[in-house]
């Protein structure tokens, strides 16, 4: 039956070919003769590899390989220079060979849902035209920072994986509009997410998040889903304070940072000559109240932002707990309205 369809397609110089659900164990090599083909559908078969003859499909823009038996992304796709949409959902893929990503300069959409992936190759950055990447329902434990170099990415779907953190480089995805991270193991979000000025939809439901980054309320979200997280609640209680004792490292760091902040030429010159010290100090934080720069020791507080009127939220969420860092109890004791210490149970 498949051979008959292919023969008719060759005679008619077809631009599309539907071989879905034919129980194919291999792709007939005659498909390579369909040089006018722009869309090839091979869903719901028994395929585990592609023939090299497919490389002749120089005009192919859409390739459907969902619900087959592929264990890795087939390297043959690198020859499909015009490919824009690639569907590989519902396979057994646990590997993406770096070579498979060569030549896919025009790929806009990649669907890898429902596979067995634990990681992505660093070469993912080669997909510079990619706008939508979906890797829901895999076993992803981390995402490489190189993924954040995809400047045209608009949608990133990573729901139902095993992610416990996100790279700081997430802030590089300046065109991102939709980020789906539900049902992972995230305990927080990087501060860099607040730089995603086009982000409209954020889904972090079903994680372990207690509070959001300090500038989260400034992200232009229209939809926020965060149900089934242990979010901090506004329940003030009396607590005794124990004045902090700074380590020698912290005292020294604050002294140096203070001089650097005041543009002291001696300290600026010295820090330029000591790259290790410069690297350590680059991870500084800033007190939300007094503006003091500090390194490793701080008081983690929270403020609550009313987001109900600003965006669509899940579970009737009205007050969003937003992380605030203070340099000392001295600042905390200024009794700034709306800033609360985080209770440790």
Swiss-Prot record:
InterPro entries listed in its UniProt record: Leu-rich_rpt (IPR001611), Leu-rich_rpt_typical-subtyp (IPR003591), LRR-SigEffector_domain (IPR050715), LRR_dom_sf (IPR032675), LRR_R13L4/SHOC2-like (IPR055414)
UniProt LRR repeat ranges: 13-34, 36-58, 59-80, 82-103, 106-127, 129-151, 152-173, 175-196, 198-219, 220-241
Source organism superkingdom: Eukaryota
One family name in Pfam for this protein: LRR_14
Keyword Repeat: yes
Record key words, sorted: Leucine-rich repeat, Repeat
Family that this chain belongs to: Belongs to the LRRC69 family.
Record protein name field: Leucine-rich repeat-containing protein 69
